[in-house]
Amino acid sequence: MKARRNKKQVPSFRKLIKTSKVKLEYKLKNKQFKQQSTIKKYRKEQRKLRQAVKDAVSKKPFPLEDPKSKRPVKGMEREEEDEEDQALPLDMMDDDDLQLMKDLGQKASFLTRDLSSSEPVHIKKRKHESVIDKYEKMPRTLQTAPEKELIHLLPIKDKSGIIPQTREKPVTDIQQEEEDEEELEVEEEVVENPIQELTIEEHLIVRKKKLQEKKIQIATLASSILSDPESNIKKLKELRSMLMEQDPDVAVTVRKLVIISLMELFKDITPSYKIRPLTEAEKSTKIRKETQKLREFEEGLVSQYKFYLENLEQIVKDWKQRKLKKSNVVSLKAYKGLAEVAVKSLCELLVALPHFNFHNNIIVLIVPLMNDGSKLVSEMCCEAVKKLFKQDKLGQASLGVIKVISGFVKGRNYEVRPEMLKTFLCLRIKEVEVKKDTEDINKPKKFMTFKEKRKTLSRMQRKWKKAEEKLERELREAEASESTERKLKLHTETLNIVFVTYFRILKKAQRSPLLPAVLEGLAKFAHLINVEFFDDLLVVLHTLIESGDLSYQESLHCVQTAFHILSGQGDVLNIDPMKFYTHLYKTLFKLHAGATNDGIEIVLHCLDVMLSKRRKQVSHQRALAFIKRLCTLALQVLPNSSIGLLATTRILMHTFPRTDLLLDNESQGSGVFLPELEEPEYCNAQNTALWELHALRRHYHPVVQRFAVHLLAGAPSEGSEALKPELSRRSAVELFEAYSMAAMTFNPPVEPSNSKKKDKLLQGDSFLNEDLNQLIKRYCNEVTTEIPLDFTKCLKTSVQ
């Protein structure tokens, strides 16, 4: 039979250290309660003992045996026997009998028993002897000191065997109160010193003093660590222990200060490489003192960084679960601010230390918080992820974040915030193509093959060449300078995950609020999509537009995505995008000044891709129709939108020179212009004129006026009607953003009115008419007299 394996695990040292203060307090209370219960038991026994002695002394003891007396049958006979016993004089008893009775009176446990109610005594001698033996066998307790409690220690084993070890448990001396029973039963009341109540001003002064002391302590520890990190790495633990500040007056503030201080310390003292754990061979080898000191610094840094991240994670988790520990001195309301500081620190570490240990753990913590209900927390996390994407040149950290976000979105069944997917727009994928061109020009040095080395180099030279190549390889790894192939591989894997996420949403969650972010992302990365997916993707986009379930902004995103696809690798495809032109032409009139200007920016991007960049595929009739509709739309939108639309009209008039016929009257051509027709090819736009420009010449915004005059003159590049360089060299989107009134400011600023005409001040009499002036003065100077009012005359006249 195999020995039964003990499944109970030995608690680790970390677990033993984590014993809470509440548990220790409960242990101490239980110990004190046991001591008090032991004392009470002892007092109770002593009280019973004294009472039994008093009763025994006051009563006359009965003899052990009485052969004549049997169990009474009648009450009268018993009373007579009692009278005879009481009448027995003490002179008839021997001295030995009296001494025996006194000795028996001292035995409390013996006298407490009711001897009179014992079983009847028989006359026979054997029976009498058995009764005496029975009493002799009964245990007797004397009035002695209580037994001392023993503590069992670990036994000692020697040749003879196991020797148990014990020790007396220390017991406090208790004064025995023997006066009254009532005094023994009354518990001692502990008189507590009354706490002195402080006023609000005094409390604030005390709190300020405590907080100042804690700040000085934090600053001292942080400065000592920064001055010499390798020697003072142990002080990180002391600083981190202040995260458990228990003073309720300054607990929240001190914890926030410690979190921020530790975050800045780790950003400063962390090396620019990842610290790996040592192997057994490395631990066993002898090293120099400097190397040993560096190893101790790295191990201490990694362990304290790990514990710090665990503390931040626990703070955020407790806040999310809305629970606090019983011993916690921080309220739930204040815990929210503490959790926000913890999230901010995690975001800073995510951006600042993407190369260091536990970066993936930080990503796993940050990504779910991007979808948090708190807007502040969600924005902080999304901004941190965007910063990471923008500054990540290699792509390793971006790939890790993309994997976690994709899995989170899928796990939540695509019910997440759109801001999570909008972070994909900050990926640095396009820069690979630029770097590829530069690297093609400056090609890296290729290593020689074995045959080339053998032909050109001697044996010693080959040996040195091999050592040099090995050194170059190690330096490249140390500097983290990855090759172009490595970057392309990482970026390809990242884009695959991004497109898989986008296509899943297009397929399964077409009515999701994530659709605009998906379409915007597809529009940005459309040039990197495989050509094989273009046909299916365009069909899906057209189906979404025709379904009617999308808002005008979402439908504009579909149009923008479709033309981004067709303007890149899609040029080789024979696809007619006329339906997308029609949809954009139809959607333009849904924009107006009563709505937000977000749609205008998308329209400007679409017009640039659809008309300017595809000028060879755009017909003359289509260009005329769009120019006419853009000028009409400029009348009903905000000034910055009008400037962007007029700038686009100027570009189209330069791109399609024959559109200047719209500046003539509408009597030329055949047919009638149909402004409400949804087909731009058949609306007869050549039969109309841009009369809207005359209305825009009187616009209150000076830049709109300038653009209208410039377009009426035929959009010249030179001359008095030409635009200033600050307007002509900027794109339509840049002008739209530059003159935006989102900040509630007018650009250009409104000039103050400085009229040179002075108002004529009337001196003397206010009224120029003398008769009126005299009449007013007379009535003002008259003394009012009370005259009774009589309306009877008026009533009579009215009746008549």
Swiss-Prot record:
GO BP terms, alphabetized: DNA replication initiation
Localization annotation: Nucleus, Nucleolus
Keywords associated with the record: Coiled coil, Isopeptide bond, Nucleus, Ubl conjugation
Biased composition (Basic and acidic residues): 52-77
One GO MF term: chromatin binding
Biased amino acid composition, Basic residues: 40-51
Segments for region (Disordered): 37-90
Glycyl lysine isopeptide (Lys-Gly) (interchain with G-Cter in SUMO2) crosslink residues: K333
Coiled-coil blocks: 450-489
A cellular-component GO term for this protein: nucleolus
Compositionally biased residues, Acidic residues: 78-90
Family affiliation: Belongs to the CBF/MAK21 family.
Protein name per the record: Nucleolar complex protein 3 homolog
Gene that specifies this protein: NOC3L
